């Protein structure tokens, strides 16, 4: 059955999700159709930003408008909505939408996201950490907990999707006692181009000119997908002046001592086995630009593994936009199978 999707919020994640879907459709791995997108931006601007992207380049198909309410992408047509009144006012039932990808960043708690269900959708996937959701899923880590009964689902954050596979391999193979992480993260639209007011006075500073320390909920969110690690991990983010391509540095105390070679071997086995497609293993001395448009959630850099006694440090890269958007497509596919 083709899963019919509505996108609420056609910004960076909404558009990246759609491009990732097109890529997976070409590979024959996604039986998903986007039937509508809701955004208060005018349609000509939405079509232009879908066609031309500073990171992903030009979309290799025609993008245009049909009438005043349809965006045409190749042979596909997307009903363009501009509903401001909130999720409950959207015509998902009339459009036969099965799953809504909620990517505005505004409706991340269950009470607000439930409006999509009231409007006729069967499931809601929130493209961010959420509050009071039915379940948070990190693919490859706890997707086996999805049983079809959960209706409001969080795809966690891009950083949690990178961190969780690292934590899973280390905890499964050696046991994690406790740990700290840092994500060196590309800037995002939540930061300022120039110095200006912001509730976070570090994010108030010019994103392209500074390394900006700030918070991340990724480490604490691990407890949502790996309950045995609740309260055992913490950390923060350093936002840096690049548009995409981030890296997570995780240092943990292990229950069982392991050498660098043993740790790397465990990650290589996981990348070739149970986490294939989620975790990637690299021997090469790569830098951030090398992983842009890589669809994996977590790209393990074996050359950066360090060990002192029972303490281990591992590093994994991730395209915080493209990798995450591909997991959104995968999660829509997973949820669609339960409909």
From Swiss-Prot:
Residues where D-glyceraldehyde 3-phosphate binds: 157-159, 188, 203, 216-217, 239
Quaternary structure annotation from Swiss-Prot or TrEMBL: Homotetramer.
Main location (coarse class): cytoplasm
Residues the UniProt record annotates as site (Activates thiol group during catalysis): 185
One of the Pfam families matching this protein, by short name: Gp_dh_N
Catalytic activity, EC: 1.2.1.12
Active site residues according to the UniProt entry: 158 (nucleophile)
Record's keyword terms, sorted: Cytoplasm, Glycolysis, NAD, Nucleotide-binding, Oxidoreductase
Cell location: Cytoplasm
Gene Ontology molecular function, alphabetical: glyceraldehyde-3-phosphate dehydrogenase (NAD+) (phosphorylating) activity; NAD binding; NADP binding
Similarity field: Belongs to the glyceraldehyde-3-phosphate dehydrogenase family.
GO cellular component terms listed in the entry, alphabetical order: cytosol; extracellular region; peptidoglycan-based cell wall; plasma membrane
Classification via NCBIfam families: GAPDH-I (TIGR01534)
Organism: Mycobacterium tuberculosis (strain ATCC 25618 / H37Rv)
GO annotation terms (biological process): glucose metabolic process; glycolytic process
Protein name (record): Glyceraldehyde-3-phosphate dehydrogenase
InterPro entries found in the cross-reference section: GlycerAld/Erythrose_P_DH, GlycerAld_3-P_DH_AS, GlycerAld_3-P_DH_cat, GlycerAld_3-P_DH_NAD(P)-bd, Glyceraldehyde-3-P_DH_1, NAD(P)-bd_dom_sf
Binding site for NAD(+): 12-13, 39, 84, 127, 320
Stated role: Catalyzes the oxidative phosphorylation of glyceraldehyde 3-phosphate (G3P) to 1,3-bisphosphoglycerate (BPG) using the cofactor NAD. The first reaction step involves the formation of a hemiacetal intermediate between G3P and a cysteine residue, and this hemiacetal intermediate is then oxidized to a thioester, with concomitant reduction of NAD to NADH. The reduced NADH is then exchanged with the second NAD, and the thioester is attacked by a nucleophilic inorganic phosphate to produce BPG.
Highest taxon, organism lineage: Bacteria
Stored Gene3D superfamilies: Dihydrodipicolinate Reductase, domain 2 (3.30.360.10), NAD(P)-binding Rossmann-like Domain (3.40.50.720)
Pathway: Carbohydrate degradation; glycolysis; pyruvate from D-glyceraldehyde 3-phosphate: step 1/5
PANTHER family: GLYCERALDEHYDE-3-PHOSPHATE DEHYDROGENASE 2
Catalytic activity: D-glyceraldehyde 3-phosphate + phosphate + NAD(+) = (2R)-3-phospho-glyceroyl phosphate + NADH + H(+)
């Amino acid at each position: 059955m083709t899963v019919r999707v509505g996108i609420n919020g056609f910004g960076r994640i909404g558009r990246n999700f759609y491009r990732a879907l097109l890529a997976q459709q070409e590979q024959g791995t996604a039986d998903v159709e986007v039937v509508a997108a809701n955004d208060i931006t005018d349609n000509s601007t939405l079509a232009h930003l879908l066609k031309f992207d500073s990171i992903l380049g030009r979309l290799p198909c025609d993008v245009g408008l049909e009438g005043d309410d349809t965006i045409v992408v190749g042979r596909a047509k997307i009903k363009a909505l501009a509903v401001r009144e909130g999720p409950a006012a959207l015509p998902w039932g009339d459009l036969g939408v099965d799953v809504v990808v909620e990517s505005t960043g505004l409706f991340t708690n269950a009470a607000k996201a439930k409006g999509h269900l009231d409007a006729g959708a069967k499931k809601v996937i929130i493209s961010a950490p959420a509050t009071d959701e039915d379940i948070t899923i990190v693919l490859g880590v706890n997707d086996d907990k999805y049983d079809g009964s959960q209706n409001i689902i969080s795809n966690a954050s891009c950083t949690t999707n990178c961190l969780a596979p690292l934590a899973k391999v280390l905890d499964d193979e050696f046991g994690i006692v406790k740990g700290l992480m840092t994500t060196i993260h590309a800037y995002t639209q939540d930061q300022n181009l120039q110095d200006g007011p912001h509730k976070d006075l570090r994010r108030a500073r010019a994103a392209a000119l500074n390394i900006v320390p700030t918070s991340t909920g990724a480490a604490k969110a691990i407890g949502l997908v790996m309950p045995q690690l609740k309260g055992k991990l913490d950390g923060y983010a350093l936002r840096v002046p690049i548009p995409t391509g981030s890296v997570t540095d995780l240092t943990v105390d292990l229950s069982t001592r392991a050498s660098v070679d043993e740790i790397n071997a465990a990650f290589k086995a996981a990348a070739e086995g149970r986490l294939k497609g989620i975790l990637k293993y690299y021997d090469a001395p790569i830098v951030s630009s090398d992983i842009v448009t890589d669809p994996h959630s977590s790209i393990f850099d074996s050359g950066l593994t360090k060990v002192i006694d029972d303490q281990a440090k591992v590093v994994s890269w991730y395209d915080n936009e493209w990798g995450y958007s591909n997991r959104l497509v995968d999660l829509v596919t997973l949820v669609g199978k339960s409909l």
